[in-house]
Every structure is written in C-alpha cells, then in structure tokens.
Amino acid sequence: MKIELSVQPWDPGYSSEGATAQETYTCPKMIEIEQAEAQLSELDLLASMFPGENELIVNDQLAVAELKDCIEKKTMEGRSSKVYFTINMNLDVSEEKMAMFSLACILPFKYPAVLPEITVRSALLSRSQQTQLNTDLTAFLQKHCHGDVCILNATEWVREHASGYVSRDTSSSPTTGNTVQSVDLIFTRLWIYSHHIYNKCKRKNILEWAKELSLSGFSMPGKPGVVCVEGPQSACEEFWSRLRKLNWKRILIRHQEDIPFDGTNDEMERQRKFSIFEEKVFIVNGARGNHMDFGQLYQFLNTKGCGDVFQMFFGVEGQ
C-alpha cells in the first residue's frame, strides 16, 4: 500500500500557483503485511503444485499458524518463527535412474524483498557438487528473482539443471528400488512440542516406541513437553503417526530436519545428535515436579549441538 503525499517546497518567494513536488511514502507496517500475505499465497500455490505425499512438507507448522494469525490481525507483532518447508522432487538423472532432490526453504520475515534461504540436497551429490549447485542456484535467484516470490522458479531451475551436477560414475552406478528406496535415504530429526506430558502411560509409550523403531533422541515430560526423535525417515513418520493418535490437548511438529545420506549404517550414526533415546527430567529446585528448568534444557541441547532449536520452541534465546 502506497500513500501519495503532495509536498510544496518551502520558499518565502514561492507561489502556491506553481507546480508541486510529489514524494511516495510507503508505510512500513503495510509492507510487512504485504510480505506476509505474499508468503502465505506462495505456500498455498506450492501446496497445489506439489500435492503428493511427502512432496511438500511444512517443517514448522507453528510458524505458518503465526503467519496466518498476524495477517488476520494486520500486525506482525508476536511473530517469532520463519516459515520453513521442504520440497521433495524425484528427478531423472539419467535414462535409467531417478533420484530425490530436496529443497529446504526458509522464508525470512522480509521475503520476497530479500531472497529465501534455500538448500538443495541429494544422496547422489558429493559435498563439492552440492556446494556448487547451491552456489549456482543462489546466483540465478539473485539475477532473475530479487524482489519477487521465487520458490517455483527455484524448483524449475533445479529440475532443469540438477542432473548436470551428478557425476557420470554416480549416475551410472546400479541401484534398486529407485523412488521407493529414496525415502529411506533420508535421515530425519523431529522436534515435537506438546502442551504438556504428564501421563505415565504416554511417557512409557514414547520410550517403548522409540526403542522399537531404533530411534535416538529424548523426551522431556512436564509443561510444556518436548520430544525429539531421529533416525530413518520412515521410522520417524511411524513414531509420529502413533504419537499423534493419543489424546493430547495440543501436539505438533515444531521443527523437522531432513538430511539425505548414503543409506549406510556408518553414515546414519554420524548424522545422529543423540546416541540413545532417554527421558530427561530437568527439575527446578523448590518448584513443583511438573515444571522443568529450561536453563538446564538449553545447556543439554547445546552439548548436543542443537542449541538453536531452543529459540524455535520457545521464541526466546536460551541462557
């Protein structure tokens, strides 16, 4: 929304009969709302363009809920999280083979005035190939899409150019399962937020299901409750499917990480932040048992290299 102002230059000898100079002033608040509306519209468009299961994964559902709420209230106050989603595309890399390419997309608050943060990954790409692909994609977006929504442009660019970054040796190597197997070549880490976790049966289920599915991570009972599981994508999806069917006041995936890997056990173990799955209880001295010490939680996450997740969960920086 632009507000046109007619301004007459101040001059003692200036006559009002003369021409007026015009300035254009854009209200910062309206710019923020328009940017938020553009983000939501693009997300709706992407949902229609990628309707298949696991084609479009909203990694941070709460961020989208915050975005919608801010648009409805016409204010960006209270918005704490960036919209974060992943687009998975199965692309032809040779005449005989398809491979999954994942675009992890984070939309800054000022997007589309600034470029999105996009990282393309595939199990077929070496580290240097992946770096070069992402560098070239960023250069393309800077040249052609600055100031406009551009996620679809990014997907089309990857669709057209991805095969050129896969080495001939890699693309010609034998494989089995193609698309079906590619799902299991994703290492997933789910960060689950619950209004509270008190019930002993639920806590027991969480521990038993994680063990059954060979997932590592932790659960923190109390109010709020936190659960993190990591392992093969299919196992994490099964865990979430079981968990969400229980009776909860509120539960959601607050953050999701999807990391392509080569499918070997050694590589999977290297991706893990946690060696086992355990229940962690961080009790505040002198407080009721259902209130946890978030300072201890933050320190625990920091030791695991996950300190940045704290702000995603609670909207404040950990201490």
From Swiss-Prot:
InterPro entries reported in the protein's UniProt record: Phi-like, Prp3_C, RWD_dom, UBQ-conjugating_enzyme/RWD
Residues annotated with Phosphoserine modification: S275
SMART domains the record matches: RWD
Keywords on record: Phosphoprotein
RWD domain sequence ranges: 41-165
Domain of life: Eukaryota
Protein name: RWD domain-containing protein 2B
Source organism of this protein record: Pongo abelii (Sumatran orangutan)
Name of the encoding gene: RWDD2B
